């Protein structure tokens, strides 16, 4: 037991932490070098070294998570290159949610927070937009959101 604690409390979850790290911290304009990756994993209770991380990156690639290595001078930076949604697509969805009259302000904020989780923390700030539509009042009825879903289910 003591040996496992020395190695790190979350070693078995290393690939999950790596995938989360790349999803939350990297994008086309933001990458991490090996030292940053090792430090961020250590903060999560995961010990790692360069050699095993290279193998882990390949495991992620084999699973379909596109990790790119980019040379920056003497350093190599790593980043996630492909996501389920592109940033412009998410901006469109955010604008649609904000402008939808039948979605409450609270539910709009919840949905937008979920959409923000699909991009890096850097790109998430670009999704914090405010769509202004004159004379558009958002509903106060929280059940409308679920009623629309129920109607759709009934139609199908």
Report the location of each language-model feature.
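Short, basic/aromatic recognition patches that contact phosphate-bearing ligands
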Residues: 1-96
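Bulky hydrophobic/aromatic content
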Residues: 86-156
């Amino acid at each position: 037991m003591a040996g496992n604690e020395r190695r790190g409390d979350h070693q078995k979850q290393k690939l999950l932490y790596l995938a989360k790290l790349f999803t939350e911290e990297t994008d086309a304009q933001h990458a991490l070098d090996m030292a940053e990756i090792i430090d961020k994993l250590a903060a999560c209770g995961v010990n790692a070294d360069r050699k095993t991380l290279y193998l882990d990156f390949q495991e992620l690639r084999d699973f379909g998570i596109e990790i790119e290595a980019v040379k920056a001078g003497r350093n190599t930076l790593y980043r996630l290159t492909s996501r389920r949604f592109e940033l412009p697509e998410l901006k469109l969805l955010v604008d649609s949610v904000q402008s939808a009259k039948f979605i409450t302000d609270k539910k709009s904020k919840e949905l937008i927070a979920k959409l923000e989780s699909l991009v890096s923390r850097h790109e998430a700030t670009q999704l914090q937009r405010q769509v202004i539509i004159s004379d558009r009042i958002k509903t106060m009825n929280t059940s409308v959101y679920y009623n629309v879903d129920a109607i759709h289910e009934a139609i199908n």
